[in-house]
Amino acid sequence: MKKLIAANWKMYKTIDEARATGRELVSAVAGSLPADREVLVCPPFTALHALHDTFKDVEGFAIGGQDVYPATEGAYTGEIAPGMLLDAGCGWVLTGHSERRHILGEDDETVARKTAFSLKAGLRVVLCIGEKLDEREAGRLEDVLAHQLQVGLADVDATYVPQSLVVAYEPVWAIGTGKVAGPAEVVEAHALVRSLLEARYGRDGAAIRILYGGSVKPDNAAELLSLDNVDGLLVGGASLQAVSFSRIILA
């Protein structure tokens, strides 16, 4: 399967800024995108339509939502349904991002509902998991990741594996901090995630792509992508500028 290089633009960029960055990115990458790479950009909801227009004729580029609500429609002020994301041109959605877990209080059960509902609606999902620093220091890495996967995938059957499900490992202590998990730490965590997915879904589970996220930058992308069981990257701050993100895509 192709390496997936995903950008999470979080709460940055106006529509015009998103369109300009998207065009710069296409100009920098489209003609030289390796056959084994695909690009996903998750902008703010307001910029989805603009980026869809920018990427619609560019092979290997897709857009996704940063979040979703597990309902078809309803009186859920401020939320967005999977069908609305699809209507805006999205093929993907993020669920369980650490900032939603730890800033907005989303629990594993909420993440599970969003993940299952989105898959059933026809979106592909990047499910984010990862431990906090105190959990790693307490030797609880396996317990934390196993629990997040067990609950987060509780209602996801093998129908969606491996083609529609991606798991992103993002150690919380490395997100936006400038700290990067060392190669041995990344390999350990990704091997653990791979074994847990294989135990749950068998051979197809072992084929689920696992991304690394956490202070990914142009100067560490190639090393991260070379590590065992790293099938792509989830990029935050370094994806906001086309110059730096294009270097990561082509690393």
UniProtKB/Swiss-Prot annotation:
Which terms does the record give in the GO molecular function aspect? Answer: triose-phosphate isomerase activity
Query: Where is this gene product found?
Result: Cytoplasm
- For binding substrate, which residues are annotated in this chain's numbering? 8-10, 176, 215, 236-237
Q: Say which enzyme class the record assigns.
A: isomerase
**Any one GO BP annotation for this protein:** glyceraldehyde-3-phosphate biosynthetic process
Q: Which Pfam families match?
A: TIM
Residues forming the catalytic site:
97, 170
The pathway where this protein functions is:
Carbohydrate biosynthesis; gluconeogenesis; Carbohydrate degradation; glycolysis; D-glyceraldehyde 3-phosphate from glycerone phosphate: step 1/1
| E.C. number | 5.3.1.1
PROSITE patterns xref list? TIM_1, TIM_2
Q: Which domain of life is it from?
A: Bacteria
* Reported function: Involved in the gluconeogenesis. Catalyzes stereospecifically the conversion of dihydroxyacetone phosphate (DHAP) to D-glyceraldehyde-3-phosphate (G3P).
Tell me the PANTHER family matching this sequence.
TRIOSEPHOSPHATE ISOMERASE
Quaternary structure annotation from Swiss-Prot or TrEMBL: Homodimer.
Q: What is this protein called?
A: Triosephosphate isomerase
Its source organism is Nitratidesulfovibrio vulgaris (strain ATCC 29579 / DSM 644 / CCUG 34227 / NCIMB 8303 / VKM B-1760 / Hildenborough) (Desulfovibrio vulgaris)
Taxonomic lineage per UniProt?
Answer: Bacteria, Pseudomonadati, Thermodesulfobacteriota, Desulfovibrionia, Desulfovibrionales
Task: Give the encoding gene's name.
Answer: tpiA
